Amino acid sequence: MIVFTVKDMTCNHCSGAITRAVLLLDPAAKVRIDLSSHRVEIDPAAADAAGLGAAITEAGYTPVLVSAAA
């Protein structure tokens, strides 16, 4: 499980954009988003934390890695 906080994720549009960015990189990933805590949890199938963070950044957001447990 890879967890990011994304403070500039504030609405459903933001969460959808982040989900799409993650799934473009890793189509089999499972993404859970909690808007109230600005938390993005990703259970990746193929991508690593660096790649996922880069994908979220490319989508226009500022991810901060919280944890990257296997």
For every predicted segment, state its role.
Residues 1-70:
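Flexible metal-binding regulatory segments at protein termini and peripheral loops
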